Amino acid sequence: MSFELPALPYAKEALEPHISAETLEYHYGKHHQTYVTNLNNLITGTAFEGKSLEEIVRSAEGGIFNNAAQVWNHTFYWHCLAPQAGGEPDGALADAINAAFGSFAEFKTRFTDAAIKNFGSGWTWLVKNPDGTLAIVSTSNADTPLTSPAKPLLTVDVWEHAYYIDYRNARPQYLEHFWALVNWNFVAKNFAA
């Protein structure tokens, strides 16, 4: 089984003015596609051929892991975003955020701070621990919570290719705009699952 680039859940220009169509053209159309292509090339003729993406991420190492995890991470990230989104979550997710961080504002501050301080390339995540509590986790490079007991709920890509076209080296500015796009419906579904 070979993997294909999953369709975006919106048009490339739908996230403007926060994330440009040009960024999506490169980030999704080039970077994400390259991870898919590399993964297919690397798994051909191996024990990973025919396995699900999640199975590969949880059991592979080296180049196969890096490319599989980046395919999964990016696909998850695209679903964490939506046009005309943002705002704040409600219901059980809002209650869990308040229990873990004191308030939504405090969560947003801590998540943003973790993403800004995530050195180099990587991802910052909101995860649900096996005991139901929430935590903010930063991972480097292709690392992902899929390899841990925690369940990913939300992520932001802090590799420079995620924001360099629109914001150059100003990661904090990118993160400020990220909050206007967070798809809380997707995050809430992950939390409830």
What is the role of each PLM region?
Residues 1-193:
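Feature for soluble, non-membrane regions of globular proteins
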